[in-house]
Amino acid sequence: MPRRPRTTHWVRYISSVVLFFLLILQGVPASAVPMQNDPNGFEGIPWGATFSETDSFMKVQDAGQSQTYELKAGTPSLGPVKVDSMRFVTSEGKFARVTVRYQGKATHDQILAYLQSLFGPLDRTPGQIASGPVKFFSWTGLETDVKLRYEIGTNLGIIFFESQQLRRKMTDSSSDTVF
């Protein structure tokens, strides 16, 4: 009976070690924090509301079941913080998601403070905050999920405010709305 070469054992060992370190370097998602004040929508617009072009919103993308809108006037802001873009997404004509993009460490810190003031503080227990080149933060309510992803190396952030009920209907084929 032929004997396996010893290199197979070392290859497995080294592969396991490399995989372990790659997983650590990717950053571990922070646990979702229960949302203290679920807004059941975004800035006064309830999830599931009929949404169309108005004086305030213009359609920028139509993907059949999903339409994407942006604000017509001014620089978008999340609370007091100016952001690069804010897109409002519908599923079958019903308001379902907002995608916010921003850049810069100072902007990230302001947004994180603002979101914590709205939805509750993050769990600062060791091991609960993401480390590595990508940080994830999440608040989960009964009707709303808020997920923030921030890349330290590029200082780019993206936030999703989503209706839990309408999330399943969303088409994630559009790169503008994919996490």
For the regions a language model picked out, list residue spans one by one.
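A low-complexity, Ser/Thr/Gly/Pro-enriched, surface-exposed linker/loop concept
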Residues: 71-82
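Bacterial N-terminal signal peptides
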Residues: 15-26
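Extracytoplasmic
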Residues: 42, 81-83, 93-95, 134
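Non-cytosolic coordination micro-motifs
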Residues: 3-5, 32-71, 99-179
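Short, surface-exposed beta-strand/loop micro-motifs that present aromatic residues
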Residues: 85-88, 148
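Coil-to-beta-strand transition motifs
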Residues: 91-96, 156
